[in-house]
């Protein structure tokens, strides 16, 4: 769930390819977040990886005060997508911030656990990653000394053409439980089934060779041209075929975890959250529900 310190009541200032069904909002609104959790539950989405920047914006406050309590009322779990793993200065302050939030939150029944440990996803930009194997080891030691064992998911993919796997030094790094990456569009402009299958299979080989779990992204669409007019591009919806193709390719590669990128990253246009600009606002959530063998029944809209 994205959080930022914008002016959510002034929709004209938002630079989005299409509009949320409920209008502009931010993730400190309990009614909106509760609705998000009910939408996810209705579709069969198991968990949210929540964009977390600590005190750098409202995401830290939103996670602890709003999102975690909202998830508690549903079967949906939540975990930290630690963006500070990419955007930080020294490791010491990052250890303190991450250990602090885990100390306060990991015991909550709504916090996502895997193999009995709290999950933390460490976001990295493919072409300029901040963490090194050595600094990750320092981060892991520092955090686990304070909170106990953590299930670490590392965002890691080579971006130089012809590889697109996991760098050898990272495959050899201890303490990483799973490898994945945020989006194919960050490294290659592909979206067709015939392109995705070998791409995911190549990445999966590296992850399996390292003996780690495999996390693969799935996109319903993309349109980041509003926020990146020079470099942005679009992946069309294709009447649902785009998301179906990603889903099929991820399953064929043997993914342990399917990353639905994204629930509500509106500026990039990768969302499954209902939009007022779609003939069926719930089109993507209905797709996910079918995968889970259920009929999607929309929960009531939040009071605004």
What are these regions (language model features)?
Residues 1-304:
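Glycan-processing catalytic domains of CAZymes
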